[in-house]
Amino acid sequence: KDEPASGAQLDYLIGAAEETRNQALACLAVLNTYKTVVVYDPADAVMIKRTYGEWGLTLTAAVVTYPAFLAERFAAAALTVPQTGGTLTYQDPFALARDLGETEEARKIVNAAGHTVEMLCNRKDTMWAGNILMSEWMPDVIARVAADRIINAKNVGADTIVCASVSEYASLKNAAPAG
């Protein structure tokens, strides 16, 4: 409810402009009222965990990504994971994998849910699966990118792609064949 934008989307669209910095400062003021903040969107996580520091902004709250938060809960036996019965593969969000080096946290949860296989191009070598923002001006390209990633998953025998990025999830869902 009271979550101002991190500045990640503006940074993507217009770079480190004054509007972007102002958005980041407004977000930082709210984040610093908390002890710990769980960040759901990988792009926001990179903005908050890395870019704020690069800009000299002081973050006092501990910031953890959603996959890392879930993995911590799972390791502490505070979270159980139901078995899926299918074959799963994890779609590494490039922002978590490349920018933050976070690739294993989500796998701890996915591996506990069932049989897991790895797509070619995983972890830091991940292949992008789409972007909500970019689909506004190049929908055909984003649809193709997502469709290609679905093919990658099928080629390794996966029937389910698990995503940590809402943006990639939306792109994959839109590109998925009916049924």
Predicted regions and their residues:
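Iron-sulfur cluster-binding electron-transfer modules in prokaryotic oxidoreductases
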Residues: 1-179
